[in-house]
Amino acid sequence: MHPAFSVIFLTTLIGAGQGLFLALFTVESYAAFGLLPTQSDAFYAIGSAIAFLLLVLGLVASFFHLGRPERAWRSATQWRTSWLSREVIVLPAFMGTVFLYGMTHWLGFNPVFAQLPSGAPINLTAVLGSLAWVFAFALYICTGMIYACLRFLREWYTPLTVINYILLGGASGFSLGAALAAVLAPDVMPLLAGWALIITFLGLVGRSATLVRNARLKPKSTLQ
């Protein structure tokens, strides 16, 4: 398969942006439960800005493979049956929550609404981060299912397509998170680097499984 470069840029940039946000929220979640030192708001704000920039660049790349970009908004109207329509809806929702998450950290406005029995605070960034976490995985699923639901492309018509989107996007994002932590939050760099290695290995396993599966596919028809 040889997809257009715009599709490659779209999926790579947006997937990395999703993964970077997940890395940031992983650190904040660990810190909330006392498993890591509390990090500066600048770490989360700058990381969110980078994730948001990747999402914007991916969105820009998506317009290059649209025949009529000015009609792109209409694709959201088929959300009941189309994974592309669902992606068009979930992507801006995810971008919006990532933006608010980053701005909340940047402004230092983070009121606490309640506490869990463990003592972990339920604050504004925890709420926004949880919403963005849901949107991030929903977006991975929507993007993967755009290709995994195509029966005539047997190489993609498999749950492995969705799994690989999640793993490879997560590997890219956690690697970026580890690089950012090396500069702004050295205390959490080993955690993010470790997760990046684990997810990358799982991505290798998933991709290898896909290649093995595709190699065993038999054509349904021949020229003979």
Task: Describe each region flagged by the PLM.
Residues 10-16, 32, 79-83, 89-224:
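Long, contiguous internal "core" modules enriched in hydrophobic/ aromatic residues
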Residues 26, 36-97:
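Membrane helical hairpin/interfacial module
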Residues 22, 65, 176:
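Hydrophobic/aromatic pocket-lining and membrane-interface residues
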Residues 1, 5, 46-52, 68-74, ...:
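Hydrophobic, membrane-facing alpha-helical anchors
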Residues 1-54:
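N-terminal signal-anchor module of multipass membrane proteins
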